[in-house]
Amino acid sequence: MNTNTIKKVVATGIGAALFIIIGMLVNIPTPIPNTNIQLQYAVLALFAVIYGPGVGFFTGFIGHALKDSIQYGSPWWTWVLVSGLLGLMIGFFAKKLAIQLSGMTKKDLLLFNVVQVIANLIGWSVVAPYGDIFFYSEPASKVFAQGFLSSLVNSITIGVGGTLLLLAYAKSRPQKGSLSKD
């Protein structure tokens, strides 16, 4: 195994563990049943941007599956899949962000937030509700209400928390041209 693969496997494990812990400890209820404000999606976005789509997918998928299994006894697979897809979609745009070389510019932050809002809308407002209807025979009105609210709260969570995490990470990295030879 090369060093990059090992780094990504370790990142996936750490990301999934953080997803589980934060998801179980910070659960802010909303007026719609079985729909909570979940702060772990900010961490998922951070891992997807830093390590790419594979780590993003598996962090969300494994983290959500294990969190549901521990918390509820069994995973709700359509939502588990969407957590993975959210990490995957955000991770695909990671190379467009110059976080490793030049920090986060306003353009990078705008792109990140446009991508995460679109990914949230596709995942929670389309994939999750249709999956719930098809696989679980859930009522359409219920799952679309849950999906739209999840899109909104997860977009806000990632927009605020994910942006702050990315800014903190970018500031911790040496910037291109910041090191000079004495």
Swiss-Prot record:
Membrane-crossing residues? Answer: 9-29, 42-62, 74-94, 109-129, 148-168
Q: Which UniProt keywords apply?
A: Cell membrane, Membrane, Transmembrane, Transmembrane helix
Family of the protein in this entry: Belongs to the UPF0397 family.
The record's listing under InterPro entries reads: ECF_substrate-spec-like (IPR009825), UPF0397 (IPR022914)
- What protein does this entry describe? UPF0397 protein SAG1634
NCBIfam families annotated for this entry?
PRK13661.1
Species in which this protein is naturally found: Streptococcus agalactiae serotype V (strain ATCC BAA-611 / 2603 V/R)
User: Which membrane topology describes this protein?
Assistant: Multi-pass membrane protein
Q: Which Pfam families match?
A: ECF-ribofla_trS
GO cellular component terms, A-Z: plasma membrane
* Compartmental location: Cell membrane
